[in-house]
Amino acid sequence: MEATFATAAAFQSIVGALRGLLTHATFDCDAHGMRLHSLDVERVALADLRLRRAGFARYACERKLSFSVPVRGLVKIVRTADPSAPLTMRVAARDDRVRLAYETARRAVSCTLAQISLDADRLGVPDKEYTCVLAVPSAELTRACADLARLGATTVEMSSGTTGLSFAAHADDGVRVRVLLRGSPQRPLTQAFACCYLNKLARASALSETVDVCMDASMPLRLRFRLGPLGALDLYLAPRVPSVGESAQ
C-alpha cells in the first residue's frame, strides 16, 4: 500500500485529533482507501476514520492489508514534516515497519515506525439515522467543553431542543454552568457524558470549521468532522448515567 497526502498538514491534523484519545491506531486498507477503527483504552470512545482513495494525491493498494502502530510514535514522525510538503506512507504485506517520507526542495526525509501486534477490535458503528443532528462551529464546541473542564465539571448534560444545543453541569465550589450553542430546532433530548471525554473529542475541531453533533436516545453520541474530498472522522462516545451526587442531575 502506498498513500500520498497532498500536504503533510492534512495528516498532521488527523493524527493530532487522535493523539489524546488513542494509544494505538489500526488501519485497514483496500483499493477504495484507508480506514482507522479503534477504541480508546477504557473502551468508552471509538474513532472511525475513513479516507477515500480520491482524496489522496496518489493511492495504490493491490490487496487488502491491516496494520497497527503506536499513536505516540506516529505523532513524533508526522510532526517533523513540513506542513506544505507531500507526505507518503508505505506498507508492505511482509514488512513489520511502516515507512513515511516527505521531501522539499532542500531535503528529503524518510522514517520507519515499528508495527505492533494486537487483537484489534472490530466493533460495528450505528447504521441508522440519528434523530438529532446539529451543525455547530467546531471552535465553539471546543471552547464550551474546555470551559466546563476548567470549571471542574465531571459530568455534562447535553440537551437538544428548540434553541439549539445546550451543555449543563455542576462544577467545583458550588458553580453551576449552562452553555447554549444556538442552532436549528431539534427534537428534545438529553444525555449525560463524562466531561473529560467530551473535551478530548472536541479537540478534533482543527479538522473542520463545523462539526455535526448527532444524538439519539438509543445510540452513542457522534461527532462528525468532514475532511472534504479526503473523507470524514466520526468520534463516538457512550452516554453516562450519573450517580447521585455527581455533577449533572
UniProtKB/Swiss-Prot annotation:
BP GO terms, sorted: leading strand elongation; regulation of DNA replication
InterPro entries per UniProt: DNA_clamp_sf, Pr_cel_nuc_antig, Pr_cel_nuc_antig_C, Pr_cel_nuc_antig_CS, Pr_cel_nuc_antig_N
Entry's family note: Belongs to the PCNA family.
CDD domains: PCNA
Protein name per Swiss-Prot or TrEMBL: Probable DNA polymerase sliding clamp
Cystine crosslinks: none
Pfam families recorded: PCNA_C (PF02747), PCNA_N (PF00705)
GO molecular function terms attached to this record: DNA binding; DNA polymerase processivity factor activity
NCBIfam families the record matches: pcna
Coiled coil: none
Described purpose of this protein according to its UniProt entry: Sliding clamp subunit. Responsible for tethering the catalytic subunit of DNA polymerase to DNA during high-speed replication.
DNA-binding region: 60-79
Key words of the record: DNA replication, DNA-binding, Early protein
Domain of life according to the entry: Viruses
